[in-house]
Regions:
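PLP-dependent amino-acid enzyme catalytic core
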Residues: 1-343
């Protein structure tokens, strides 16, 4: 019997007993669609976990332990932009397992440092071969004897964990006509879509990606998604009609401005989701198709924008954008729609 299965860590970190998400209403004064009966709400992961990837990372390690892929002698390796890697590193550290995070050279140093600080069995490296992505590197290393790659970009435990833990808490707090989330692994959007489908809900799930050449931390461009992600996202989303996109500058700017509007300081991938949400709502207002999303109980469109983590791991990137030097540092513009196409 693999003793890791019965480790006390699993009981202590049971997501079903934690608060995983909080919901705040976006001020109507800052909502460009308030007069159209649209209520914009912000769902932020910071609750009793640092970020929403923690339950998913836990599920990935536990799934492999139960299946016997991870034993006390296994080295766990995972491609990560930071949050999943940090969560898996914490879990492996507690279990006494060696963990290697594969991270791109452009990952902020602050995100690398929180993994490095764990010390002990935890290490990180960049891809070693020319043209190799972090994901392909982790998959290659995971095939070695006594190594295992949980692979958040392919493992069904990723969307399943969001459907099992995040979705019930989210839908228990608010009606959700439209759910907008940054797309990194496609796991969050697939999990919410799966939950909605299984519960007979009409919720429209909108994944938001970076425009090509407009990278935002913890999100992907469509070309990178096609290269790395093996989860069957096409079962839920049409590439031509269901995806929204955003630019880097607008994503950083809108997340920065949101710190004055809600009691949370969410990171740049939230800004990307907010850009995508506003673009989505603008498109449907122009085409006269907003009514299809109205909730039967109150006739309102409840648009929920998801923020996976807060701003602190990206301090250096915010400073590099120098948002504090321009007019936006003095207040929030009256019309956010003027900002969502900025580059």
């Amino acid at each position: 019997m693999n003793d890791l299965v019965n480790h006390p860590l699993w009981k202590a970190t049971d997501p079903a007993k934690m608060r995983l998400v909080r919901v705040w209403q976006f001020p109507p004064e800052a909502n460009p669609f308030a007069k159209d009966g649209v209520i914009i709400k912000i769902a932020g992961a910071p609750g009793e976990v640092m970020y929403h990837k923690w339950p998913m990372a836990r599920a990935g390690i536990l799934d492999a332990v139960r299946k016997g892929f991870i034993t006390p002698d296994t080295t766990v390796v995972e491609a990560t932009s930071g949050n999943t890697g940090h969560a898996m590193a914490c879990i492996c550290n507690a279990l006494g397992l060696d963990f290697v995070a594969i991270m791109a050279p452009d990952v902020p140093g602050s995100k690398i440092d929180v993994i490095r600080a764990l010390g002990g069995n935890v290490s990180w490296r960049t891809p070693e071969r020319r043209g190799e992505t972090t994901v392909s590197c982790a998959r290659r290393l995971g095939k070695q004897d006594d190594w295992h790659n949980p692979d958040q970009y392919q493992g069904g435990w990723n969307p399943r964990s969001h459907a099992e833990y995040l979705a019930p808490q989210l839908f228990g707090q608010t009606p959700v006509s439209i759910f907008v989330t940054p797309a990194g692994t496609m796991g969050t959007c697939m999990g919410i879509a799966q939950y909605a489908r299984e519960n007979g809900l009409s919720t429209k799930v909108v994944p938001v990606m970076c425009e090509e050449g407009q990278e935002v931390p913890a999100a992907r461009t469509f070309s990178r998604m096609k290269k790395d992600i093996l989860l069957p996202w096409q079962e839920y989303f049409d590439a031509e009609t269901d995806l929204e996109y955003g630019t880097r500058y607008a994503s950083f700017l809108l997340s920065y401005l949101s710190w004055r509007l809600i009691p949370a300081q969410l990171g740049p991938s939230f800004g990307l989701a907010l850009v995508g949400a506003l673009r989505f709502l603008r498109k449907h207002k122009i085409s006269g198709t907003l009514d299809q999303f109205r909730d039967a109980s109150d006739g309102k469109v409840h648009a929920v924008v998801f923020g996976p983590d807060d701003y602190r791991p990206y301090n250096g990137l915010y400073l590099a954008e120098r948002l504090y030097d321009d007019d936006y540092a003095r207040g929030v513009p009256s019309d956010l729609l003027e900002l969502i196409d900025l580059r």
